[in-house]
Each structure stands twice: as C-alpha cells, then as structure tokens.
Regions:
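Catalytic cores of nucleic-acid ligases and guanylyltransferases
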Residues: 1-334
Length: 334
C-alpha cells in the first residue's frame, strides 16, 4: 500500500493516522524456520539486516506476513545514513555494522498469519488483528516494535509537530480500505518540509542544450569552505532562459572550494560530471525533506531568492540533524 503526497493532514471521520518513519519499507515473511525480508520493490533485505531477520525468527508465532519499516536508532534518534551503510556486499562488514548499531523493525500492518490472508480485510479489522498479534509476540521481542496509530487528528498533529527531526511525517489511511499493494487511493502522506538558505556555486546545462538544467547548491562548513550539498531543477522554460543569462555572466572557477559535484550515481545514471562554476554571490532559500550524508537526499524546491543575505551566512548549522524524539512514540505503545 503506497501513499500519495498532500500538504495537510486530512480531517474528518474514517481516517487512521500513523507516524511516517524515516527508514526502509520492508515486508517480513516467516514460515516456521524460514524468514524472508523484502523491500517495497521486491529486493531481498535479510542479508543486509541479519539482526532483524534473527529477531523475527524467534517470535512465538511461526507463520505470518508483516508490513513495516526498518530503522536504525543511534543515541536515541533514527539515522537514515546508518541504513544506507548496511547495503554493503561484504557480509563481514554488515555483521560489524549490525553489532555496532542494531536495526529495528517497526510494524504497522499484519497481512497474513497461520495460513489466513488478510489483504481483503479493511484496515480497521487488520489493526485489531495486529494489536492482538503484537500483545502475543512483541512484548519480549528484540528489535521488533509496534507502531502507534490514532484516529484523532489532534494527536497526529502533535506527533507531526513535536517528534523532532527524525520523523518523516504522518501517514493517513482509510479505515474502511483493504490492503492494496502499490495503490495510492486509500492513503496519503504529509511529510516534514524544512528550508535552508544556500549559495549557488555552479550549474549544469540541460542534456544536449546550452540552457540551464539545474543549479548546484552549496553551504559553508566550519572549515570555511563552500561544499556542494545538492541541486534544484524545477524551472519553467522561460525561467531556464533567464537563469542561463544570469549565471553565465557569473561563471568563474572554482565555484565550490570544498566538496565538489560528482558524476553519475546509483540514483542518476545519465548525469554528467561536467558542471560550470560560478562566483558564490547568489543566495536562494530552498525547501527540502532530508539532509543526510552531507547533502540533500532529494532535489530541492526554490522558495525565494535571498538578495538580502550574505553568502557567508549560509552555513551547515542550518541543516544539522535536529534532536530526534520519535522513538518516544514507540514507548507509549507497549
């Protein structure tokens, strides 16, 4: 079951609200001695999260299918970067990481147990079944947690506003809807959106054209260097023409004096390594969802230009990981 994005938490009757955890979506299958962990796009995950697979293997129930989120708590907060480190080809490396920072599996749906498939049961019924399953299996479970849920929008709003920097947002699901894999008709998500003032340190031309495709964003670190942290690219054709004229006039090396833009990655195979440096004079406020590993996890959206702000004031402290409080939500469910 997938969720479509909306800007506000929906109100009215018939909704169940849940925290949107910042982790890897995972379906967990248990058939007696066999455990299989699967990502939302069908890829196996157990080799990367043996600690979670082991925890599921010793639950009292012997046959079930769960839907949930893999997370890694570090110092009382959730860190997405630690999840990405687990995707390593060496089993010895994965085991070392698992020992240092064990992962947890936060369960929010029960899809089957003991040969009974619950996909056609409405969410209201599945939640009751999951609550019973959790009471019987999770109380002494290691690394397996029960995700809270509420039908009160007031409580959902408190979660959204007070849980801190490691909660991804809120998911709202229709109580009268069955489980539909891949569909977006019965669930919506409201994500945490943050803003930061960044310096434009360069740009890339659009593929096969001499017109700007994306602006490259930077922030100053404690070392005084301008580090590349991401990009923004949602422009109209007319805006691209105007930006091309503006930033071609500012072309000057080096642009970024610290970490510089790279080439293709596992997310963007077609991206070119070529980019044009500009004088770090233009400041832009952008909206983003997450900042991990020294960069924006996804593309950003321009909020406004900031001619009133000095570029040197655009520092990394704007995006430092905020205090995480979302794990406190789990303690209230068991």
């Amino acid at each position: 079951m997938e969720a479509r994005s909306v800007e506000e938490i929906p109100t009215g009757n018939g909704w169940q609200y849940e925290p949107k955890w910042d982790g890897f979506r995972c379906i967990a299958f248990r058939d007696r001695e066999q455990v299989y962990l699967q990502s939302k796009n069908g890829q196996p995950l157990a080799r990367y999260f043996p600690d979670v697979a082991d925890a599921i293997a010793v639950l009292p129930a012997k046959q079930f299918v769960l839907d949930g989120e893999l997370v890694i708590p570090v110092g009382g907060a959730l860190f997405f970067d630690e999840l990405q480190l687990r995707l390593h080809p060496a089993a010895s490396r994965v085991q070392k990481l698992a020992k240092a920072h064990p992962a947890s599996y936060i369960v929010f749906d029960l899809l089957a147990e003991n040969g009974q498939v619950y996909l056609q049961r409405v969410l209201r019924e599945r939640r009751q079944l999951l609550e019973h399953f959790a009471r019987s299996n999770f109380r002494s479970a290691k690394n397996v947690r029960f995700s809270p849920a509420t039908t009160e929008v007031r409580i959902a709003s408190e979660w959204f506003n007070k849980a801190g920097g490691d909660l991804d947002g809120i998911i709202a699901k229709r109580l009268d809807a069955p489980y539909a894999s891949g569909e977006r008709t019965a669930a919506v998500k409201v994500k945490q959106i943050r803003t930061a003032d960044c310096v434009v340190g360069g740009f890339r031309y659009a593929s096969g054209a001499r017109i700007i495709g994306s602006l490259l964003l930077g922030l100053y670190g404690n070392d005084g260097l301008l580090h590349h942290v991401g990009f923004t690219s949602s422009f109209t054709r007319e805006q691209r023409r105007e930006l091309t004229k503006k930033f071609e006039a500012l072309k000057k090396a080096p642009g970024f004096t610290g970490n510089a833009p790279g080439g293709p990655s596992r997310w963007s195979k077609e991206r070119t390594a070529e980019w044009e440096p500009v004088e770090p004079r233009v400041v832009v406020e952008v909206a983003y969802d997450h900042f991990t590993g020294g960069r924006f996890r996804h593309g950003t959206k321009i909020v406004r230009w900031r001619p009133d702000k000095a570029p040197r004031k655009c520092t990394m402290d704007q995006v430092e990981h905020r205090e995480g409080k979302s794990l406190a939500l789990l303690r209230s469910t068991m």
